A protein has these predicted regions:
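Well-ordered alpha-helical scaffold segments within catalytic/enzyme domains
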Residues: 13-24, 64-80, 139-157, 201-211, ...
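Aromatic- and carboxylate-enriched substrate-binding clefts and catalytic-loop regions
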Residues: 129, 196-199, 231-233, 242-245
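Active-site acid/base region of carbohydrate-active enzymes
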Residues: 1-46, 73-138, 151-200, 305, ...
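Solenoid-like repeat scaffolds
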Residues: 190-191, 220-229, 257-263
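Boundary/linker segments of alpha-helical solenoid repeat arrays
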Residues: 43-44, 229-231, 262-269
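Alpha-helical repeat scaffolds
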Residues: 213-222, 252-255
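Non-catalytic C-terminal accessory modules of carbohydrate-active enzymes
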Residues: 153, 164-165, 172, 249-374
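Short, solvent-exposed loop/turn segments at the edges of secondary structure
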Residues: 9, 59-62, 66, 111, ...
Length: 374
């Protein structure tokens, strides 16, 4: 059981596992504070904290902003989130001085790790000599979007407007630099010779494409074997894009790697595909919460989990049930296909409302017991 360092990319996923399985946000809060404390004068965080050795992965500073945003969505602790906004601003300033006139990032220092895909050298995706990487630009775009959301609600409306403008500018640059109209996908660099599942997943999550266009790109991303394939870590982001685009019914069919680990007798999840070992690895544990968020469909619809959206994707399952802890109690869901209809029983904590979405239909949920038929 190998991995013990608190790497940011790993920890963001592990924090969601902890919230969905225990509801206890204390470890997540502690991680957010420790990573914030590792920031340099330039604004970047360590790749892992605490650590006696300095190591920097710029993209992990962006995922830290994502962690703060996740905490805001799922925990009722706005004070902690507000206290992290100076750190969020510092991280974005580190990236802002490295953005070119169009908004795209230039050459970045340190280890620009994204995933362990075989075609990525040392985990680093293709980057042109002057910079220009769709994967880095898309992660920065998401960070600006998260920051704008938090600033507008808990911080400075003026800074929220600045973040939105940075996001708009970067959105335009990404579309111009990386969109390949012939292949109808986002390339990894402006040369448009290399394409990855990573770029398409991030484009969907960053709202570069939405609606039917997002669904189309997700389907082709899953089915196109010529794309650089996401490995265990980045499969979480591919699965999240599937869910967002409405293709969550494919999720259970995407778990072959995890089934193979069980067949090999591994007792904890691995970091990467074979050759591997049983790492007890945080990012490999993403199905532990995705089964609740995608299959049962339970997610936060407002900061503090004060409203819930339940949008299940059963795949081939006929019957499924489960429950997750919530800051105000428990959310329980039981679903069954019967006589050509979906029968749903949903229990929400007192004071929590929401919406149940099934195949384009939406029905309101109220506190307590809800019985629905679609």
């Amino acid at each position: 059981y190998y991995e013990q360092l608190q790497y940011v990319g790993d920890t963001r996923i592990q924090a969601l596992v902890s919230l969905y399985m225990t509801g206890d946000g204390r470890l997540m809060r502690n991680a957010i504070e420790q990573i914030d404390s590792s920031r340099t004068a330039e604004g970047a965080t360590y790749s892992r904290a605490p650590s006696r050795l300095q190591q920097y992965i710029p993209t992990f500073s962006l995922w830290w902003i994502g962690m703060v945003h996740d905490y805001w969505l799922y925990q009722q602790d706005a004070g902690l989130v507000a206290s992290m906004l100076p750190g969020v601003r510092a991280v974005l300033s580190f990236f802002a001085v490295r953005q070119g006139s169009r908004g795209s990032l230039g050459r970045m220092p340190w280890w620009n790790f994204v995933d362990w895909s075989a075609q990525f050298q040392g985990g680093v995706p293709p980057i042109e000599n002057g910079g220009f990487s769709a994967l880095l630009d898309l992660q920065l775009l998401m960070a600006y979007q998260w920051a704008a959301d938090m600033e507008a609600n808990l911080g400075s409306p003026g800074l929220a407007a600045e973040d939105r403008e940075q996001a708009r500018k970067l959105h335009t640059a990404i579309q111009a630099l990386y969109w390949d109209s012939g292949r109808r996908m986002y390339a990894d660099t402006p040369a448009r010779t290399e394409f990855s599942q990573h770029a398409q997943a991030l484009a969907v999550l960053a709202h570069m494409v939405e609606g039917n266009a997002a669904r189309d790109i997700v389907v082709r991303t899953i089915e196109d074997a010529d794309l650089v394939q996401a490995t265990i870590y980045f499969r979480h982001y591919l699965h999240s894009a599937m869910n967002l685009a409405g293709e969550g019914d494919r999720y259970l069919d995407m778990l072959g790697e995890w089934r193979a680990q069980l067949a090999r007798g591994m007792t904890t999840w691995a970091e990467s595909p074979e050759p591997s070992r049983s790492d007890c690895h945080a990012w490999g544990a993403s199905p532990n919460f995705e089964l609740f968020r995608t299959v049962l469909g339970i997610d936060s619809a407002r900061p503090g989990f004060r409203s819930v959206v339940i949008r299940p994707f059963l795949g081939k399952l006929e019957k499924v049930s489960g429950a997750i802890p919530h800051p105000q109690g428990e959310i329980a869901v039981a679903l069954e296909r019967r006589d050509g209809r979906l029968h749903a029983e949903v229990s929400l904590p007192q004071g929590v409302t929401g919406q149940f979405v099934w195949q384009g239909q939406a029905k309101a949920l109220h506190p307590g017991s809800n019985t629905l038929v679609f």
